[in-house]
Amino acid sequence: MMDMGASSGLGFMKMHGAGNDFVVIDSRGRGGALVTAGLARALGDRHRGVGFDQLAEIRDQEGADCALDFWNSDGSRSGTCGNATRCVSDYLMRDLGRDEVNLVTARGRLHARRREDGLVAVNMGAPQLLWSEIPLARAMETDSLPLEGTPSAVGMGNPHCIYFVEDAEAVDLAGRGAAVETDPLFPERTNVEFASLIGPDRLRLRVWERGAGITLACGSGACATAVAAARRGLTGRQVRLEMDGGVLEVDWRDEGVWLSGPVARVFEGHLSPEMMALA
């Protein structure tokens, strides 16, 4: 377990999965959640804080190895984060001396394991394919939305809008991503993905994350894109996704969508009283 000693300030760990980077705070045994929206915003500032795409807070949870809460760098909450879940699972498995863990998130109970090749895999649960579950603003088919480019919508505990394009590299990711994120069709805003088919069951994927902007990778986005591609007949259910920060693997099975990929622990530290005061 990371050093959370109060004498040296609140402890944290920096991790990333395929370049999708996180601050992890372990609040187990501390009497409840410690992170606030203000603290998340302060920590998320890459110039004045630590910087991250998402923050993951580990809490005590009866009947599971932990509960897990997610925050975006703008201080908003996120219902799920696939790569952060994999990173925290790696940390917990090392801490507990096991190769499998169970975590509770807003998405529900998730199971993670370490594969024989060393990659960390997590079952992200069944995709949400009904308009009311994602959610969208009104009833419609979710595999072909009434927007320019006819994207798909998939929920993975958070909403995703997926465009299949000829060349993902040519997309104005910042411009189009920001515009689609706040489209009225998505009452809770949305993550935005642009994907190109580059080989059998291989996709090039670029991501604009709700509340974070452009990120090098997105686990739930990889899952949503793989599901959307399979629904359209572009790929099978086992897909390799090549993102700016690395490669993620998705396997859509009957029991849920499995996300696999690398995990890296970067450093540990403690937040100063001055940083805590910014919260």
UniProtKB/Swiss-Prot annotation:
Its main location: cytoplasm. Substrate binds at residues 20, 54, 72, 82-83, 158, 191, 209-210, 219-220. Pathway: Amino-acid biosynthesis; L-lysine biosynthesis via DAP pathway; DL-2,6-diaminopimelate from LL-2,6-diaminopimelate: step 1/1. It is an enzyme of class 5 (isomerase). GO terms for biological process: lysine biosynthetic process via diaminopimelate. It catalyses: (2S,6S)-2,6-diaminopimelate = meso-2,6-diaminopimelate. Its EC number is 5.1.1.7. The active site is at residues 81, 218. GO terms for cellular component: cytosol. One of its GO terms (molecular function) is diaminopimelate epimerase activity. The record marks 160, 209 as: Could be important to modulate the pK values of the two catalytic cysteine residues. PROSITE patterns: DAP_EPIMERASE (PS01326). It comes from the Bacteria. It is found in: Cytoplasm. Coiled coil: none annotated. NCBIfam families: DapF. Homodimer. PANTHER family: DIAMINOPIMELATE EPIMERASE (PTHR31689:SF0), DIAMINOPIMELATE EPIMERASE, CHLOROPLASTIC (PTHR31689). Catalyzes the stereoinversion of LL-2,6-diaminopimelate (L,L-DAP) to meso-diaminopimelate (meso-DAP), a precursor of L-lysine and an essential component of the bacterial peptidoglycan. Belongs to the diaminopimelate epimerase family. This is Diaminopimelate epimerase. It comes from Cereibacter sphaeroides (strain ATCC 17023 / DSM 158 / JCM 6121 / CCUG 31486 / LMG 2827 / NBRC 12203 / NCIMB 8253 / ATH 2.4.1.) (Rhodobacter sphaeroides).
